């Protein structure tokens, strides 16, 4: 089966970053990272989801967290220099990022937004992120993702 390269994959190629494109079966009724991890047969702690938020001071920013967790809005606000923040409404995701729910990658959005990745990403030799479409994940080293996304490592949920 031929896998079409996504914008995120092309940007990783351009940056000479090693990665794998891993397809999985999409369930339109369950777009969760938990489903993705189960489909891949991988540890949910290594399958990260991308969330877009809006802060009261900084505007839009991106949080990347392990799939089974929910972002702590107070911690996200603190990390991003805001007093408060909230997830953006779903209807804003595509026009803002170029991505849809279940296929939002921290790499290759229409515009670069400040990006924050939960610190546990460094516990693993590789993690999974969306490749920018439903049904396709990027498997890459966390340090490569941090570098390419120009991300800061921080705590985004209480463990």
For the regions a protein language model found, what residue spans apply to each?
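Extended, low-hydrophobicity, polar/charged segments
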Residues: 1-159
């Amino acid at each position: 089966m031929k896998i079409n390269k996504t914008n995120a994959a092309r940007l990783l190629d351009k940056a000479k970053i090693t990665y794998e494109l891993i397809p999985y079966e999409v369930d339109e009724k369950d777009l969760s990272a938990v489903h993705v991890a189960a489909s891949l047969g991988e540890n949910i702690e290594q399958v990260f989801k991308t969330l877009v938020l809006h802060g009261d001071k900084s505007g839009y920013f991106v949080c990347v967290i392990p799939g089974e967790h929910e972002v702590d809005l107070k911690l996200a606000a603190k990390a991003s220099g805001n007093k408060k923040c909230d997830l953006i409404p779903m209807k804003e995701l595509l026009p803002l990022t170029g991505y849809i729910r279940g296929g939002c990658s921290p790499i290759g959005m229409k515009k670069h937004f400040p990006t924050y990745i939960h610190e546990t990403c460094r516990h693993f030799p590789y993690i999974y992120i969306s490749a920018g479409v439903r049904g396709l994940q990027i498997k890459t080293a966390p340090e490569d993702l941090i570098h390419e996304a120009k991300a800061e490592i921080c705590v985004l949920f209480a463990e």
